[in-house]
A protein has these predicted regions:
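Conserved signature/switch motifs of ABC ATPase nucleotide-binding domains
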Residues: 81
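Conserved ABC ATPase "signature" region
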Residues: 42-58
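Helix N-cap at the start of a conserved alpha-helix in ABC-type nucleotide-binding domains
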Residues: 97-99
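Catalytic "switch" loops of ABC-type ATPases
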Residues: 12-13, 18-23, 122
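Q-loop/switch helix immediately C-terminal to the Walker
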Residues: 26-38
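Conserved ABC ATPase signature
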Residues: 61-65, 69
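Hydrophobic anchor residue at the start of the ABC signature
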Residues: 75
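Catalytic Walker B motif of ABC-type/P-loop ATPase nucleotide-binding domains
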Residues: 86-90
Length: 141
């Protein structure tokens, strides 16, 4: 099924929520595979995930992974979806500095000329990823 919001096909939008919204009993690979159309290549997904997750975590149920690992699975799922717009809500929550830099490289690699909308409190993160940055510095009611 498809629908549109102001003429934009909602199937062209991918989102990573602040809460990971993963399927707990599925592996990292299967959580990514489930959003892909057609017959996704399991080995390609594995190779893709290896750039941000250790090999021994890829086939484990995501409910057994750490918070930072779950975050990276959610990110991989959002970036793997073939949408034109990718919305990432606080993608760096729970990540240490080195992991965050690795994830930033991953985002840039997986971007594929698509539009990213990233909500973050980290000005440095926004500067590394953003071509255009909009800063909200007051509460909006």
């Amino acid at each position: 099924d498809s629908g549109s919001i102001s003429g934009i096909d909602i199937k062209s939008i991918s989102c990573m929520f602040q809460e990971n919204r993963l399927i707990p009993d599925l592996s990292a690979i299967d959580n990514v595979r489930i959003v892909l159309r057609g017959k996704p290549n399991r080995q390609e997904i594995r190779n893709n995930l290896l750039s941000i997750l250790p090999d021994d975590s890829l086939d484990m149920p995501v409910n057994s992974l750490s918070g930072g690992m779950k975050r990276r699975v959610a990110l991989a799922r959002a970036l793997s979806y073939p949408g034109k717009l990718i919305i990432l809500d606080e993608p760096f929550t729970g990540l240490d500095k080195n992991t965050k830099l690795n994830v930033i490289d991953y985002i840039l690699k997986m971007r594929n000329n698509r539009t990213l909308l990233i909500a973050t409190h980290g000005t440095d993160d926004a500067n590394l990823l953003g071509a255009e940055i909009i800063k909200l510095d007051k509460n909006i009611n």
